[in-house]
Amino acid sequence: MASQGTKRPYEQMETGGERQNATEIRASVGKMVGGIGRFYIQMCTELKLNDYEGRLIQNSITIEKMVLSAFDERRNKYLEEHPNTGKDPKKTGGPIYRKREGKWIRELILYDKEEIRRIWRQANNGEDATAGLTHLMIWHSNLNDATYQRTRALVRTGMDPRMCSLMQGSTLPRRSGAAGAAVKGIGTMVMELIRMIKRGINDRNFWRGENGRKTRIAYERMCNILKGKFQTAAQRAMMDQVRESRNPGNAEIEDLIFLARSALILRGSVAHKSCLPACVYGLIVASGYDFEREGYSLVGVDPFKLLQNSQIFSLIRPNENPAHKSQLVWMACHSAAFEDLRVSSFIRGTKVIPRGQLSTRGIQIASNENMETIDSNTLELRSRYWAIRTKSGGNTSQQKASAGQISVQPTFSVQRNLPFERTTIMAAFTGNNEGRTSDMRTEIIRMMENAKPDDVSFQGRGVFELSDEKATNPIVPSFDMSKEGSYFFGDNAEEFDN
C-alpha cells in the first residue's frame, strides 16, 4: 500500500487529478459528468432521437457502448490486425429503438469511430476525458453486478460460488484505471490473479523474456492493489508472500483462495460510487444545470437528487414486472448489488427483494428478440432517504475487521450489524492443506473465529432526508436482524458471459 501521503479520495482517481481539496474535486467530477451529458445531447441530435427516445435506457446504453468502443485502442488495434473477424475496425454501432405508430422498432446504426471520438472530445472541451469514459465503464459494471451472477466464473477459478459478494467490478475492462481498481471487489482481484498464475503454469514462457518482465510488473501491481484492499496485517503479509513468489504456482492460488474466503468475514475496502446512465446527465444538462459550477459528488446526495428529478424509461418484455425492472436499475445506479437488502430497502423506501424473486431479465434486448410484443415503462428510481457511499467494507472500530455476512459488501455508510453464519464460512476452511500453513493463516483464522456477528458496523452512521444535503441530522434505522439480507441468496439469476 502506498504511504498515507499518496492516498487520494477515490473521486480524485475518477478525475485523474493531483491532490485537490473538496471544492476542486466537486468541480472536476462535475466537469466530468457535464461532459457526458453534453455528449449525450449531441448524440441524440445526430441520431434524431425525440425526447422520449432519448430518455430510453436502452438507447443510452447503446450510445455509451459506442463511445467506449471508439476509444478502445487495444481492441481497435486488434481488429485492424485481424481483418477476418468480420468487424469493420473503423466503425461502431448498436441497436437504437424508436417509437413508430405506437410500436417500438429496432434500428441498427453504424458510425465512424473517428466521428464519435470527435463528438466526445467536442463535448469535453477538446480533451480525451478518460475519466468520463471510466465512469461509463463503472456504470456498466454496476449494472452487470446487479443483473448477473458469476457462479460459473467463480467455479472455473476454483472459488466457492457463495463468494459472489466479493465479485464487484468483475466485468470491468482492464483499461479502467485507478477508478476501476478502487471499485473492484476482493474476489475480482483474486480471480484476475488466479487466471494469470494459471497461464504461467500452462505456458512456460509467460514469465520469461521482455514480455515476461512486463507480465511480472503487472502481476506485482495487481498484488499491491489487492493488498491495499485488505485491512488486517496478517492478510497484507500473506499478499506480500504471494507477490514476492519467484515462480507463482498452485501454492499461491491456494493462498489467494484462502484470502478470498477470509474476506467474507474480515472484509476488504471496496469503493462504491453512484454512476448513472448517460441519459440522466444529458437530461440535467439540457435543463440548463451547470455541473462544473455547482460541483458534483458520486458518493453524496447528488446522484440521489438527479434520480429524484429525472424520468427515464425502459423497454419491457411481456412477462416482466416493471417494478422489478426499476429495482434492478436502482441497485445498479447506486452500486448496491452486494449491499444488505434491509439497508437498501430502508433507503429506497420500497422493499428491495432478492434477485431470485425478480421477474425481470437484463436491461438489454437481444437482436433476435421479437419487438412486436415489447412495451415501455417509466423506471421508478427515486428514494426515500440518501446515505453516504462507503469504501471501508464496514469494519467496526473495536477490531480492524468485523463480522461480515456471507454475501454482503456494504455500499451505504449506515449503522447495522452484519449477521453471518460463522459455521458456514468456517466450514469452507476445512480440509485444505495445499497452501502453506503459516502463522499468518493461523492468525487470520483466529480473527475470523473471534469475530462477533452482533458487532455494530458504521457506528452512529445514518441515512438522511433528501432535503438534508449537508448531512446534518443522521437518522439511524433499526433493522430486523432475523432476516438474511443478501441479494443473490437462493438465487437463479442468469450467468454473465462475455
UniProtKB/Swiss-Prot annotation:
Cell compartment(s), UniProt: Virion; Host nucleus
Cysteines paired by S-S bonds: none
Molecular functions (GO terms): RNA binding; structural molecule activity
Keywords of the record: Capsid protein, Helical capsid protein, Host nucleus, Host-virus interaction, Ribonucleoprotein, RNA-binding, Viral nucleoprotein, Viral penetration into host nucleus, Virion, Virus entry into host cell
Motif Unconventional nuclear localization signal: where in chain: 1-18
GO CC annotation terms, alphabetical: helical viral capsid; host cell; host cell nucleus; ribonucleoprotein complex; viral nucleocapsid
Pfam assignment, any one: Flu_NP
HAMAP family listed in its UniProt record: INFV_NCAP
Name recorded for this polypeptide: Nucleoprotein
Organism: Influenza A virus (strain A/Equine/Prague/1/1956 H7N7)
Lineage: Viruses, Riboviria, Orthornavirae, Negarnaviricota, Polyploviricotina
